[in-house]
Amino acid sequence: MAEARSGSLEYTPTWVVAFICFIIVLLSLLAERGLHHLGKCLKRRQQDALFEALQKLKEELMLLGFISLMLTVSQAAIRHICVPPALVNNMFPCKKPLEEHHAPKSSHSIINNARHLLSTGESPDHCAAKGQVPLVSVEALHQLHIFIFVLAVFHVIFCASTMVLGGARIQQWKHWEDWFKKRPSQKGTTRRGHHAHAHELFSANHEFFEMHAGGFWRRSVVISWVRSFFKQFYGSVTKSEYIALRQAFIMSHCRTNPSFDFHKYMLRTLEIDFKKVVSISWYLWLFVVVFLLLNVGGWNTYFWLSFLPLILLLMVGAKLEYIISSLALDVSEKRSRAEEAVITPSDELFWFHRPGIVLQLIHFILFQNSFEIAFFFWILFTYGIHSCIMEKLGYLIPRLVMGVLVQVLCSYSTLPLYALVTQMGSKFKKGIFDNVVQSTLEGWLEDTRNRGESTSEAHRIEMQPTTPESYNVQSENP
């Protein structure tokens, strides 16, 4: 009792208490001010999508704060929950020694188990007097607390790095956009210049159709799927594909504005999607709970689960590549029927006619991959490399290799593919308007609602218009 009292706040030097409190408050204020200034910087640069993503990140930090508070406040109550020994004598992450597992449950062993489960300084008398053991120890709660924090941090880091690397990959397509916009359309341009550019454009379109629909064997569904699967590993997007899909988007949504900056539009939509990807949805937390439940020693759950993000990523990449091939095959069939041979974007190309499913799958893939790496580092620094939870080296190395492969493939292939191919849906995305136009439309809608305008007109403004070219969508250009 004397040792317990000497370790309490009552018998801790005041300078120690003040110093620790000062450090914690200082670090918290620095983090808060840093996020505040980052938000102001994004606002000044009119990066509204990234600013919204930052706000979403703050919400996730607030959720972590609530989880931390709940674990801290309920710690005393949880450690006094007593259960029969048989209830906590199975489904361990590590296999218990046989002699311990089959030992009779005497009152002496119950007390020893209680002392083992509780951290130093706790009294097992509360449960031992009932012939029971604590449900969970304070040490286990503390380690779970750290794991949740590490998981959230790794998820944010992985999502941010994926978006940055994917955005850098998309930025490499800028010269294709510049090439298309520099076509000789102004008055005074020589006829030779017109013919030269038209020939280059024809060559690019011809290359696109020959690549995906040339020859009988390319029209086979099986061959097309196999080719799409392997193409995601090399040259996932070519110049001819970019130009063909860009033309399809312009003809469907911006027919009267051929100089629309499609490349900038893609980057804006990617920034908007980042806000969704950086969050941890309820079903992702449910996935964590299920994994913690099934992480039983001998089941190798961690190893088998590491295949899931890789399999899903390969499926998504192959599907996106197959959509490009399907667009080319559709045009080829139209030519054979003497119809207008133009690429027609459609939601029917995507799973369940919903392009948004692709983003949800990428969200889950990134979270699952960050979960794998976060769990590895948490075990490494908490229990050490030789922990039984870490499993054998033969299981460990493949997991790490697959984690790195998923991160690289998603950043440099799948995410850029997603940014381009999902524009081939029936509707365009919110990012088609620049920040100024978007704010103006939202303000107009809000004023209309406040004035009590008819519901049909407000609904018409809310819906995506079919002629965005009537707005000054390029006002961001200097």
Swiss-Prot record:
Residues 449-462 have a biased composition (Basic and acidic residues). It comes from the Eukaryota. One of its GO terms (molecular function) is calmodulin binding. It is found in: Membrane. GO terms for biological process: defense response. The keyword Membrane applies. Residues 1-10, 82-145, 382-400 are extracellular. Residues 464-478 have a biased composition (Polar residues). The keyword Iron does not apply. InterPro entries: Mlo (IPR004326). Keywords: Calmodulin-binding, Membrane, Pathogenesis-related protein, Plant defense, Transmembrane, Transmembrane helix. GO terms for cellular component: membrane. Coiled coil: none annotated. PANTHER family: MLO-LIKE PROTEIN 1, MLO-LIKE PROTEIN 13. Belongs to the MLO family. The C-terminus contains a calmodulin-binding domain, which binds calmodulin in a calcium-dependent fashion. May be involved in modulation of pathogen defense and leaf cell death. Activity seems to be regulated by Ca(2+)-dependent calmodulin binding and seems not to require heterotrimeric G proteins. This is MLO-like protein 13. The lineage of its organism: Eukaryota, Viridiplantae, Streptophyta, Embryophyta, Tracheophyta.
